Amino acid sequence: MKFKKLLLILLLACPLVAEANPIITSWYTKQSGVYARVIQSSAITTPKTTWPDAGVTNNNTGGAAQTLPVYADVQRIRYTTTDVYINANGLASYTMGPWFTNSGGLFGFWPLSRDYQVRITRTPAPAATKTRHPGGMIGMMVNGVAIYDLGDAFSFHQTANSPSVTGTDGMGATGDGWWSRDALAVEVVTFDPGFAHQPGNNGQYHFHAEPKALRYQLGDNMKATYNASTNTNTYTEDITNLHHSPILGWAYDGYPIYGPYGYTAAMNAASGVSRMRTGFVLRNGQNGTQNLISTGRVTIPKWAAATFGISNPGNVNPVVLPSTQYGPTTTYRTTGPGGTTTYSLGRYCGDYDFLGDLGQTQGVGFDLDQYNGRTCVTPDFPLGTYAYFVSIDASGNTAFPHMLGKQYYGTPNAGNATTIPTNAIETFNGGPNTQETMLPLVTNPTTGNVAITWSSVEGDTYKVEASNNLQNWTTLNASVQGAANTTQTSITENGATIANPKRFYRATRTATATYDP
């Protein structure tokens, strides 16, 4: 790696100017030179840059672990006229973890660096025929963390339907399409305070719902309450100075994903800001829904039938299912190694109906369509765009379908990019490739001390020098480590202004620490 000297004076920078397009400029990069960190348990509360420690439960496939430090958030941004290309390791700069199970034990699945190189279209368009989300990644947060669908790949597998429905949930079971599980109903206990987790087979840290810690980092109407005993934050809504949510991520159809707050009137930026109300409600007998608590899971809502290809020749709502597709009653229970499971209302996607199919009007009784978005103006798109919004209820809790519905609004046109076009324009290259800059000096007029500060990369080594004439340089410190968990490093030269009528400083990166590329 070529190391560059940083001069406090005569520093002429000619940065590339990114095209004024939110899909290019909205990515979170200011902490790209910081290592990702994990808190491992309620007993091991010091954030670690490698994990898990020896002796800590590791249920990852093959015992896979993060054995080298890895840089957080988005690392590189490039674009062409048609696409944007994002490089990231898939790990956040806020402290991740810990993750627990229902019983309070360690989850045992650990996040791993993913080395993403993702392409997302810059020219999204509504799809005439909507596409159901696949398993795995369906978008990317602006910090480079994966977005998953609201489901968890499990559904109900019926073993009998007479005299009563019996069975259990399983991955890829035959209930897909009518009784597929809502991940939040089952997995939320395994989320960290940032509201994400990862599977053990690949360590892909991801979100199914609102990214609480990222929202806090971006200033999206959130506050953090620190718990000293666990060294973690609890994130809650803060509407004291309510403002329009920022872009939190991008779906793989190229449309933005905002936080939960938008303009009250979709096309009027002067209409005030409100929480965007989900269009989905539980099928509990209210709002014109069927009451599954009394009827059992013998019908499927119209939206789900259309989404999963279930025949509905009469275009009715709800759709009556054959007995072989009945789901469990809301009081049904099974007992297994993890204890007793109750199949309560809200466990499955089919437990929710869409208000638009119940005679209500979008923009009046609810704000978001069945894809969990709307066409609207936003601060980033003053002329209008289609946009998704994360959904929360009036108490600040996540609300179905949480982030995106079960289908893309637009045509999916994104994914892993094996190559980058040679004409792609680079607007950011951070992490270990950061081009450091000197920051203004801070002097103490009484002591003559000078604080020398520069932007730095965590783990790297710098030599700091001083000169009175820009020709002869004196080494002040030959080995300064880039400060931990921050993007700036400082040292002080004592009495500098008293001993020297004028003084110049420079810092040179002399070594890069070993890291996970």
Name each model feature, range by range.
Residues 10-19:
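Hydrophobic h-region of N-terminal signal peptides that target proteins for export
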Residues 202-212, 386-392:
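Histidine-centered catalytic micro-motifs
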Residues 21-192:
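Solvent-exposed N-terminal domain segments of exported/luminal and surface proteins
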Residues 97-103, 180-194, 238-241, 361-375:
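Short linear interaction motifs
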Residues 2-9:
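Sec-dependent signal peptide recognition
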Residues 253-255, 260, 269-435:
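Extended, compositionally biased non-globular segments
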Residues 85-135, 139, 209-264, 401-403, ...:
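A short, polar beta-strand/turn micro-motif
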Residues 435-517:
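Short, composition-biased motifs enriched in small/polar/acidic residues
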